[in-house]
Design a protein with these regions (language model features):
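Aromatic-rich carbohydrate-binding modules that target alpha-glucans
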Residues: 26-75, 83-118, 155-191, 201-214
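Non-catalytic, glycine-rich low-complexity segments
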Residues: 107-156, 227-230
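Conserved, mostly hydrophobic/aromatic
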Residues: 151, 240, 312, 322, ...
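Substrate-binding/active-site clefts of carbohydrate-active enzymes
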Residues: 242-319, 325-446, 468-475, 492
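Aromatic/acidic polysaccharide-binding cleft in carbohydrate-active enzymes
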Residues: 243, 496, 545-566, 581-621
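Active-site-proximal helices and loops of the catalytic beta/alpha 8
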Residues: 353-368, 373-390, 438-441, 449-544, ...
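Carbohydrate-binding surface patches
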Residues: 648-684
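C-terminal beta-strand-rich structural cap/linker in extracellular carbohydrate-active enzymes
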Residues: 698-714
């Protein structure tokens, strides 16, 4: 007997706890086994399943530490947080083996270390699971000015689904299909309001409905509660690390030394950590020093960005994302000294205003970096605490453990990842929130077009903070773009109440990169793409901040096997980068270029910080630059390439293919081959035009090695 499992009334509980899935969660136990002589006071579990938050583990009678949690099917990354510290590499413990022998593998954590990987298998259940939550964008949203409705079902059990309204019924298309589920989709002209329900048939022919009671319906109120930003959907974003981009005004270079953290960090001075090499100015092509990450200054500035705007315009760039430009004590700028002041090493407020004006003239938006979780040692409130202790009005702005203390000593106060130069702010304090929101308002009114937010998952009372920040931001500038630095797949941040997008490493780095590198085949990649696009609303993926590299990863060309800093790029790796970037430009959302990737810049496998080396403007791989220009041109000319709609088609061995755009004339088919040999591919029925060659094709075609072909349906 076929048994129907309908998750309708249970959705209330699912919504409350943020659990929206197709398969029942399974119990999984994580265990840490210390060495016999190891003194362990605390162990916690952090991973992609909890936004890298902290789940304390319990000490067991046998001396091990463990925790049992419920996780939905899929693969997850994680680390054990031992005695309040991150292990850099989960694959290597003191004796040479892994920290967690139960891990099924390891993956680059983006910071030069390795995360462990676990896999949760699907619990086999009888019947069909149906899920539709009208309050979640993954099931109902407005995308490309159409109402999108989706139903998630068990895999390989449903033959047909219809959407039923008072006006009639419409057949829904099977949009996504992966190991743990399927998604049926329908888009309609944006209605004033809509009562609707789902009716369908299993592969055995049994009818089902959702809601199960025919007298009940779901309801859409006709209001777009989470507007899509079209300028993002149709755009191309370029990330700039200002200190290493271009030196447009050498006169301000020396100012970097005067504001450096060196002047505030007593702990470093006491331990003589600056004895051999302190903060320094370097020529634009000087060798990388041991202080390259943070205190080797090359002179990049706002004037340099202004000077290169026409170059960026020529690449098809429509928005800039700038790493922190406010007063700070480092080259990277994530140790803010004054949120209301442009760093003197980059220029003045007048320089920033000129940059905004010149960018806007060219049709470019400018997104700034915001760091509300922690400050630098030179931040005025922290300096007041250093001097006055509990008598300081800013004592409760931080989490101070003892006083007096030496600035830079992480045992004296809470700091980001235990880094003493980054004391953690108490964003649960109303005064702190009011100050930070004042910063948000000021720079939006100054002309900024959005915020990328650093480590949002680490803030105290994060959800409260970002819900309020969103309200303030959208009130000041409704089309401002809000991006969260979340590395994993996590829809909870993009439900319309906090952010517009995550930094989508989960798409570009975890899925596309591994296909381009050849680490996963087309079938596995298609499965991962389905899981990704099923998790998010189409309005969200249309606003995706889609990147494959950044200031926090290795250089993408090096990671693809292109060689190390100073080498000539390996030609095969260049072709892999072209394949990877083409996929990035054809999927929903805005492709993001990290400065210099379009020029073929290499980094170092062994020295992580070299990926931030200054762009050498006299050298470039011209074929890559031409490639990126062509991709931007295609996105501007072919509407389907910037559509929010994706449908999977075929994936196996070295082949990956998917559709973009609504079904019918004008939709495009993207076909990629990550292998070393030419492969045969059967086009779907009809006439297809190659968007690069112009020829009209039918039937069997051949896709060369490491190539992507794009076809438009006629």
């Amino acid at each position: 007997m076929w048994k129907l499992v309908v998750l309708f009334w249970l959705l209330c509980l699912l919504i409350i706890f943020g659990i929206v899935g197709l398969a029942l969660a399974a119990e999984f136990t994580f265990t840490y086994v210390p060495f016999e002589d190891e003194q362990i006071t605390s162990v916690s579990l952090r991973g992609s399943f909890n936004s890298w938050g902290e789940w304390p583990m319990e000490k067991q009678p046998d001396g091990t530490w463990s925790i049992t949690v419920d996780l939905e099917p899929g693969e997850y990354q994680y680390k054990f947080f031992i005695n309040g510290k991150w292990p850099q590499d989960m694959s290597t413990a003191r004796a040479g083996g892994p920290i967690d022998p139960n891990a099924i593998g390891y993956i680059n954590d983006g910071f030069g270390g390795q995360n462990a990987i676990c896999r949760i298998k699907e619990e086999v259940t009888e019947g069909v699971v149906l899920v539709h939550n009208p309050d979640a964008p993954a099931y109902l949203c407005i995308a490309d000015e159409r109402l999108v409705l989706r139903l998630k079902t068990s895999p390989h059990k449903v033959a047909k689904v219809f959407l039923v309204t008072d006006e009639g019924r419409w057949s829904m298309e099977r949009q996504l299909q992966w190991e743990y589920g399927e998604v049926f989709r329908l888009s309609l002209k944006f209605p004033d309001s809509l009562k609707y329900r789902f009716v369908g048939y299993t592969i055995e022919g049994t009818e089902f409905s959702l809601p199960e009671d025919p007298s009940q319906s779901f309801f859409f109120d006709g209001i777009d509660h989470f507007p899509q930003l079209k300028w993002v959907s149709k755009g191309t974003i370029y990330q700039i690390f200002p200190e290493r981009f271009y030196n447009g005004n050498p006169k301000n270079d020396i100012l970097a030394i005067g504001s450096d953290e060196f002047h505030y960090n007593e702990q470093w001075a006491q331990n003589k950590l600056w004895a051999e090499e302190g903060p320094s100015l370097a020529n634009w092509n000087a060798p990388v020093s041991s202080q390259h990450c943070c205190h080797q200054y090359f002179g990049g500035d706002l004037a340099g960005i202004i000077e290169k705007l026409d170059y960026l315009k020529g690449l098809g760039v429509t928005a800039l994302y700038l790493n922190p430009i406010f007063d700070s004590g480092s080259a990277h700028g994530y140790d803010t000294h004054d949120y209301m002041k442009v760093s003197s090493k980059f220029g003045t407020e007048e320089d920033l205003q000129e940059l905004l004006n010149e960018a806007h003239k060219r049709g470019m938006r400018v997104i700034l970096d915001f760091v509300p979780n922690h400050t630098g040692l030179g931040f005025w409130a922290f300096q007041d605490v250093v001097k006055n202790g509990e008598d300081s009005p800013y004592w409760d702005w931080y989490f101070i453990h003892k006083w007096p203390f030496s600035p830079g000593d992480p045992s004296a106060y809470e700091a980001w990842w235990g880094v003493g130069s980054l004391p953690k702010l108490n964003t649960g304090n109303l005064e702190v929130r009011e100050y930070l929101f004042k910063v948000v308002r000021y720079w939006l009114n100054f002309g900024a077009d959005g915020w990328r937010v650093d480590v949002p998952n680490e803030l105290v009372e994060a959800q409260t903070f970002f819900r309020e920040m969103r309200q303030i931001t959208k009130m000041e500038k409704p089309d401002a773009y809000l991006i969260a630095e979340i590395w994993q797949l996590d829809p909870s941040w993009v439900q319309g109440d906090q952010f517009d997008s995550l930094m989508n490493y989960a798409l570009g780095r975890d899925i596309l990169f591994n296909f381009a590198k050849g680490s996963i085949d087309g079938e596995g990649t298609l499965d991962n793409l389905c899981r990704y696009f099923a998790a998010y609303g189409e309005n969200v993926t249309a606003m995706g901040f889609n990147l494959v590299s950044s200031h926090d990863t290795g250089r993408i060309l090096t990671d693809l096997g292109g060689g190390n800093f100073g080498d000539l790029p390996n030609p095969e790796a260049v072709e892999k980068l072209k394949l990877l970037s083409t996929l990035l430009y054809t999927l929903p959302g805005a492709p993001v270029i990290f400065q210099g990737d379009e020029r073929g810049i290499l980094g170092e496998k062994e020295f992580y910080d070299a990926h931030r080396y200054p762009i050498q403007w006299d050298t470039a791989d011209e074929s890559l630059i031409a490639h990126y220009k062509k991709l931007a041109q295609l996105r501007s000319e072919i509407p389907a390439l910037t559509s929010s709609v994706i449908r999977v088609y075929y994936g196996t061995d070295n082949l990956l293919s998917f559709f973009k755009g609504e079904q019918g004339n004008g939709e495009v088919l993207v076909v990629a081959n990550n292998g070393s040999e030419t492969v045969k591919f059967e086009l779907p029925f009809g006439n297809w035009r190659s968007v690069t060659e112009g020829e009209v094709l039918q039937g069997t075609i051949y896709i060369p090695s490491l190539q992507v072909r794009i076809f438009e349906r006629l």
